[in-house]
Curated annotation (Swiss-Prot):
Protein name: Phosphoglucomutase
Function: This enzyme participates in both the breakdown and synthesis of glucose.
One Gene Ontology molecular-function label: magnesium ion binding
Source species of the chain: Neisseria gonorrhoeae
Annotated residues for binding of Mg(2+): 103, 239, 241, 243
Amino acid sequence: MASITRDIFKAYDIRGIVGKTLTDDAAYFIGRAIAAKAAEKGIARIALGRDGRLSGPELMEHIQRGLTDSGISVLNVGMVTTPMLYFAAVNECGGSGVMITGSHNPPDYNGFKMMLGGDTLAGEAIQELLAIVEKDGFVAADKQGSVTEKDISGAYHDHIVGHVKLKRPINIAIDAGNGVGGAFAGKLYKGLGNEVTELFCEVDGNFPNHHPDPSKPENLQDLIAALKNGDAEIGLAFDGDADRLGVVTKDGNIIYPDRQLMLFAQDVLNRNPGAKVIFDVKSTRLLAPWIKEHGGEAIMEKTGHSFIKSAMKKTGALVAGEMSGHVFFKERWFGFDDGLYAGARLLEILSASDNPSEVLDNLPQSISTPELNISLPEGSNGHQVIEELAAKAEFEGATEIITIDGLRVEFPDGFGLMRASNTTPILVLRFEADTQAAIERIQNRFKAVIESNPHLIWPL
C-alpha cells in the first residue's frame, strides 16, 4: 500500500507542507490516482501547470510521471495562473487539468487543484483519490503517456484582449504580491489599452513583500499607498495563483467581492434580463435585493469555489461570486473563476465613467465586520459543533434562519453568520447591520450561543 498523509486531502483541493505532508512520492501516487479516475471517465489527456512557488518544478515532475506511468498523456503548460490552466484544460483537453498551487498559503505549502471532464474535483471526489492511493487501485498502462509542452499565455491573452473592450484607457495600479499573476497581468491590462503601475509583479515564491491574499486588508496597504501617491485611478490585487481579485478605489476604500458582484451582475443583466446570479452565504444582505431590482434571480449558495461552479452548471447562472474574491463568468467566458479576467471585466464597466472610484463608492453598503475566526479544539468536527450550537440556539426577533452552510440568521436590520471552514479547523463568523448598535446587538445574540460551548472562545 502506498503511504500518504491523509489530511492533505481537503474539501476543495489537496494541500500540504512540502517535504513533510506533501512529498515527491505523494505527488507521484496522486498522479496515479488522478489517472485512475480519468480512465473511469474515458479521459486520455490532461493539462498540467504550476504557479510560482519554489517547490513547483519538482512536484510537477513527480505528478507528471504518475500520470504518464498510468498511460495518460500530459499537456504541460509550465508556469501559469490557475485560470490559465483551466483555460488550457477547457480548450485543449476536454476540461481536464491539474494545477500545482498553494494559492495564498505560506511559502512552504503547495498542493493540487483538479478538474476532470469539466468537473472540479471536490469533497467526495477528493476522498476517492485518497481511497485509490490507499488501496493501490491504480491502472496498469499498455504504454507510457506522452508529454507535450506548450505556452498558452499568448492564446489566453489574445482571447481576453479580443473580446473585452474599454471605452477609454484607465490608469491603474496592480499588486500581484509576487504571485504568478505578476508574470501576465501587466501585459494583459496594457494590451487592453491601460496605463499600468506594477507592484510586486516579479514572481517570487518567498513572497518577500506581503502575503498574496487580497481578502486581508493588511495585504492591500501598498496598493492603497500607490493610489494615494500616484496617478492611478483604481487598484487591482491578486492572490498567489490569480484566481481571486481585490479592488481598491483612489481614496483607499476596499471594494469587497460581494459589492464587486453588484456591478458585475448589473452589467450582465443589462444584456441578459432575468439571468440567475449566484452568491455565497457570506455575502452582504444588500446583494439579493440589488440583483432583483436589476431584473435578475438571486441564488444563495454554500461557500466554496467547487460548490459555486456546480451550482452554476445546475442552474445555468451567468455570473457568480463569493466573498473570498472568486468571481465566475459564464457570459462571454468559460464559467471558471479568474482574477485577471474579472479585473478586465471591471475595467470594461468602469471605462464608461470619468470617475471609476465614484462608481464603486456609490454601491450600496452596510456596516459589517471582516471575517472573525474561532479556533476549534483539536480533533473536533466544525460542522458537528455548528449543529450542536444550532440545536439549542434561540435568536429572538429573527426573520429567517438559513442553514445551507452553517447558520445565517437574518434580522430586520442585519444578519449574523457562523459556519465551519472547509479548509481549516475554525468557525467563521461575520456580521452586518444598518447601524453600529444593531451589529452589536446581533453579535451579543451569537456570543451567548457560542459561549454555551465552554471550549469556544469569543473572538471580540
